[in-house]
Amino acid sequence: MADKRPSSDGRPKDFQAATHWLAGLMDLELGSGPKNPAKKDGGVDVVATNMILFDRRFQNFQIKAERGNTQWLIGIDGDDVRGSALWQPDGAGFISARFSQLHLPAANPPPPGKARAVTSNTGRLPSMDIAADSFQIGKRKFGRLELLSKQEGQDWRIERVRLSSPAGVFSADGVWQGWLDRPQTSLNVNLRVSDLGQFLGNVGYPGAVKRGNAEINGQVSWIGDPYALDPPTLSGNFTLAAKSGQFLKAEPGVGKLLGLISLQSLPKRISLDFRDIFSEGFAFDDIAATVKMDLGEMKTD
């Protein structure tokens, strides 16, 4: 854990703020690094064989932080994450980070009855400007990540999040309300996919669809954090349009297409090309649907 002693040994006044923020952000199991990661020059050098962050376990992780005049310069290197960040501690704080690789392990939710982890022991969540050339969650590959956000009172305003790859682009904006105590996430979303089969394969549904393009527009909300979608509380509405694709035999339902809608729930505005129905699956020319969600229940027009 980071050193929480008063800075009575000549360290800068904001040393405690930096180390407390790191300590509140991470639950560390120290590896070969020093037991006390605080450096005499006011920096922080943490080496961990395991680090738990947002209920995700990172392996072989190192953080080096050096203090500038008004900010901290942070280097991050690990099996899953490589990059650098700049942290300005004034006010709620501001983080600007650039990653060549940001691969988040699959989440391990806390056991029932265990309190939700608090991201910062200051009760404030920093504003963020984050970009990653390669962003991945578990085995799901999302391409390039861009995130802009800022704190507004008890909320965290998501000004822009964008995930882009050759197969498609997802963009959203919204708010993380009451993030510290009673979190709820609300987003305006847009997804444009130029190769539906490749896109679905990247995000964990290989072999569901061949070819195709699609677009989704709408608003969604759920109880919980942005990084922890809760299907039973999911509400909102969106429109779906898809063209020139084919459901493969192994995955005949649109449930695998979006993880939300089944083939049987689609409206009649679907034209089928049956040239490959007996060999590979259903080919479609055009699909259009308006979907409404209420606490996990879904209806289509």
Give short role names for the model-derived ranges.
Residues D3-A18, D41-F54, L73-A115, S120-K141, ...:
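Small-residue helix/turn framework positions
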Residues H20-A23:
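Extended, charged coiled-coil helical stalks used as long, distance-spanning scaffolds
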